[in-house]
Structures are given as structure tokens and as C-alpha cells.
Amino acid sequence: MPLLKLVFLGTGGAVPKSDRMLPTIYLEDWLGHRVLLDAGEGAQYRLLQIDVSPASLTLVAITHQHEDHTLGLPGLVITNKFLGGKLKVLAPRSMHKILERLGVEVSDSYEEGRFKITCVEVCHTVDACGWLFQWDVGYKLDLSKVAGLPKWALTNLIRGEAVKVGGRLITPEEVADLTHKRFRRLLYTGDTAPCPQMWKTVGEVDVLIHEATFADDVEPQKAHDEGHSTVADAVEAAKTLKADVLILTHISARYPSKERHKALADAVKPPPHIYIPDDFDTLLIKL
């Protein structure tokens, strides 16, 4: 079953609070990939608190160079070196040279089998990547079109491979259930102002993790000039991207609680279904 596990190790932004640390999200998929989205201060300690070894990470995906997103990275690098490994890091190209000097394997994309991560340019005050995850979950077959085919043929068709049965070449597209989505997608924006050009590049996603630094008490233009978004901006992005699930994070330390954000989110009729996690909250999502 295509199932994602998200653990929110840090849901704040810029300045930490006792109950809201800096941006760090742990993602684990049903295929066994373990990805850390940004590495706020104390990232590896927080991983250990959820019984995840820093050495077990597939990679760390950093959105941009600002310290609230990167202060936890040196510790992860050092720990991996001590354990005989080499950390893989995805980052904007402007960060590659300095990361290479740290001795990490750095890139701006990752692909393994049916899983890939790519950088999409977001609208922040520095060079920044949103990270677009895509999983190929295979085809769902229209049973009326595959009746009588052998099991091996069905397996190959689900994987996206054409088969030859009784001299007839059958492609997955011919026998697919067209109501089923083959690709499932998640986008993590990191820090961004509203970014229509990014929305156009991405198209559609199933899950959107979008920053909502501000609620509704800051002039939208002020938020945008600082490279950030409001709750309303994040909701608009989710609707444009046709996301089923919207997760709001990177909450400013100016807010003593998330109640103001929650009130705004509660006023939105699904879709999207909106979640505003606390630190250490776990969310399981069936794709």
C-alpha cells in the first residue's frame, strides 16, 4: 500500500521556541526511503528521539541556505563520517561548492527506480528549491480488459511494461483503469512567497507541505516582500495545485500558539484537508 509517514521534528521558522523548533521534517515511504526535509538546529538529536539513526537516512533535502534550515546539517555530516558513511544532500546549486567542501555527496535531484525528487524554484529572498517528490505506483488495470491474461502478464502490465500474449502486443495504456492516477506527488515548498510560476511548473500534487509564516495579522505584501506566505496564500496554492492534503508549517515565533492559524484553516471547506502539526506530530498519508 502506498503509505507515507511524516514526522514533524520542527515546525517553527527563523527563531525557535520551547515548543516549536526550527524546520525539520522526517519522511519515510513504503519503499524504505528515509528523507530529512531541511535540517534545523538539533536535527540529529530529534531524529534520535524518534529512534531513527542519522546514518539510516537516504538523503537530506535542504531548501535554501538560511541558518534556520541548515544549522543541524554539520552534526549530521560529522555523525555519518564517524560511522563510516557519506551523507547525500540535495540542495540548490548555489550551495553545492560549500557542501562539497564539507565532504558530502551533493546534487539537486535524486532518482531510484520508481521514486524521484526534483528541485522546483520557489519565490524566496535567496536561491531556493521546493522539493517535488514523485512515486510511480504503477497502473491499475481495467478488469474487463485483462480477463484471461496470465498472472505474469498482469504483473508486468501493472509495472508499466508491455507484454506479448498469443502473438498480441499489449501495452499498459490499452488496459489501464483511466480513473486511477499512476503517479503520486508531494511538494515541500520550504520558504516562499506566492509563486504562480512554480505552480505552473509543478502542475498538480496530492500532498502540499507549505509554509505559513504568518496568519492574517500581517499585510500580505509585507509577508511577500520578506519571501514568506500567509495562511490564505498557502490555501490558494493548494487549490491551484489541486492538493488533497495541505500541511501548514514554518509558523512564526510571534504567535504564542497555532490557534490563529487553526481558526483560518477551519474556515476552509475541503479539499484541501488542512493540518497544522505540532513538533513531534506524526501523520500517515495513504497516497
Swiss-Prot record:
Cofactor(s), names only, from the UniProt record: Zn(2+)
Keywords of the record: Endonuclease, Hydrolase, Metal-binding, Nuclease, tRNA processing, Zinc
Subunit-structure text: Homodimer.
Enzyme Commission identifier(s): 3.1.26.11
Catalytic activity: Endonucleolytic cleavage of RNA, removing extra 3' nucleotides from tRNA precursor, generating 3' termini of tRNAs. A 3'-hydroxy group is left at the tRNA terminus and a 5'-phosphoryl group is left at the trailer molecule
PANTHER family: ZINC PHOSPHODIESTERASE ELAC PROTEIN 1
Function: Zinc phosphodiesterase, which displays some tRNA 3'-processing endonuclease activity. Probably involved in tRNA maturation, by removing a 3'-trailer from precursor tRNA.
Name by which UniProt lists this protein: Ribonuclease Z
Cofactor info, note text: Binds 2 Zn(2+) ions.
HAMAP family hit by this protein: RNase_Z_BN (MF_01818)
Binding site for Zn(2+) 2: D68, H69, D191, H250
InterPro entries xrefs: Metallo-B-lactamas (IPR001279), RibonucZ/Hydroxyglut_hydro (IPR036866), RNase_Z/BN (IPR013471)
Residues of the active site: D68
UniProt cross-references to SUPFAM superfamilies, sorted A to Z: Metallo-hydrolase/oxidoreductase
Organism: Pyrobaculum islandicum (strain DSM 4184 / JCM 9189 / GEO3)
Enzyme class: hydrolase
Residues binding Zn(2+) 1, per UniProt: H64, H66, H124, D191
